[in-house]
């Protein structure tokens, strides 16, 4: 018992947590079927109703101002890269201010990179000294954000990297070949490390609404299929917090144990980024599309190619029309400030959502091929919302299937529009879209 107590104290885990880490051996003996709990099913519905979240890629890589992959793309030596942690002191970071900014923008949740591929942990982890507490800052970033989210009623999601470019026990995949680490691949020890960290995140930071995994694709070119044992990990998460949703950015069809289907830089079904392939779109799971506000995920000082507010608002509408949430990314600066242009875009999105939010939040997607790329639709029960995304539209020739079309009004003004019925089909006429309008919404009852 003394040895067990010592190990538990050394790792910072409770006895219950330690037993949970031993659960994979039992999980392998269970069937692959996954039956989500009642809490989980409710959480899925709540998540789908939120429709808009903020992705935050922030770590010591922000000091290089070259994006979150700089350890890989810059072919840096890992030991030299790690020294930058000694300079990480985000003196302007204010979690409450961040969350207020996101809330004012109309976002309902955040997803924060607790540990990216460079292995640096942004919380007070006991599993590695390579963390925020061993920088000059010495404050738990994850705790600050978690507390701010809980105080403001903002959903809290944690990004967690499956792959690691620093640890010697991580089995080398198709990335991370240039860091100079000593390779001693042992997936069992690495798997235990990840599970111990996940246990910390799910026991020390209050309610966590989702875990967002990334990096599974690092072994997609192995000659022998790599067994990540993700189902065991998913089961661990669901035991620790049954309502916590699991998503994995693996670019594959959903797997047993997952609660969200994720799409990277891709509105579901469009495969514009080439990551979705033949994965299809789940008809049972909530969906989420993540996209950058400029070009990079992490802060890159030279990347000032921000999408316009019009583009972002239209992306939000298109995503909602597919029945999906939009997770919009921001790469905070190393000093703890949010980039000025990003804040400006958030303000513009928030202004639009204050006036048009009922056409986004709590809605379902609508199949409406007739609209092409000019008009998309969402619905809430028998109320349909026609999102006009091009300024030259003057009429809607055909309403979506199931739309009775008894009354049509401009959502923001209440102005009534004429509904015309010809040969059994209803159309809306007399539409005048303001020149600078990103998304002109017509509410049809």
Can you describe what each PLM-predicted range is?
Residues 1-7:
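N-terminal secretory signal peptides that target proteins for export/translocation
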Residues 2, 20, 415-416:
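Eukaryotic non-globular interaction segments with acidic/serine-rich, low-complexity composition
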Residues 28-445:
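Mature catalytic domains of secreted/periplasmic carbohydrate-active enzymes
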Residues 11-23:
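Bacterial N-terminal signal peptides
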